[in-house]
Amino acid sequence: MAKLGKISDENQKLVDEAIVKTGLNNYMNIRCLSIAKQKPVIKVSRANATTEYVGKLSDTVFLYIKENVFDMLETPQKIMVVQDALSQVSYDIEKDKILITKPEICVGLESYRIYGESIIKTMEAAYMAQQAIDEAEREKKAAERENKKKK
């Protein structure tokens, strides 16, 4: 099992400021833990039912930070990494539910080294094209349902 611990006060303050800026603290508890063995520098995870029950931590999301790597970053880079991780977390007010999504754009490091910023813009264009196709399909299905109701 991975060894978990408390993150440094300096890093906790930085993360807390980022959380407050997002407003997520109004809808859920976000806890930060230091973890020694994980691949990503930062990982977002929802507390499971056992954790919520035993720890009395309802509506809790954990940020697992690989602190030895995180501490090698400059403060602006740390903020960027935390904000990127928090961008995966949202709260659906209508359904009263915490949502954790995967990033819309994933780019391999080798592709980024070769193409630079243009790969990001290309992947964004591809994502937007897919969104347009999905929206057109939803509209088409809605129109078909309306036509069936009219008949």
PLM features per residue range, with description:
Residues 29-35, 62-64, 80:
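Ordered hydrophobic segments in well-structured contexts
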Residues 1-56, 69:
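A metal-dependent hydrolase signature that marks the N-terminal structural subdomain at the beginning
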Residues 92-138:
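Post-HExxH zinc-binding segment in Zn-dependent metallohydrolases
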Residues 136-151:
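Short acidic DE-rich linear segments
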Residues 79-92:
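Active-site recognition of the HExxH zinc-binding catalytic motif
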Residues 27-33, 92-97, 142:
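Short glycine-rich, low-complexity/disordered patches
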Residues 40-43, 60-65, 87:
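Subset of Sec-pathway N-terminal targeting signals
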Residues 47-76, 92:
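Active-site scaffold of zinc-dependent metalloenzymes
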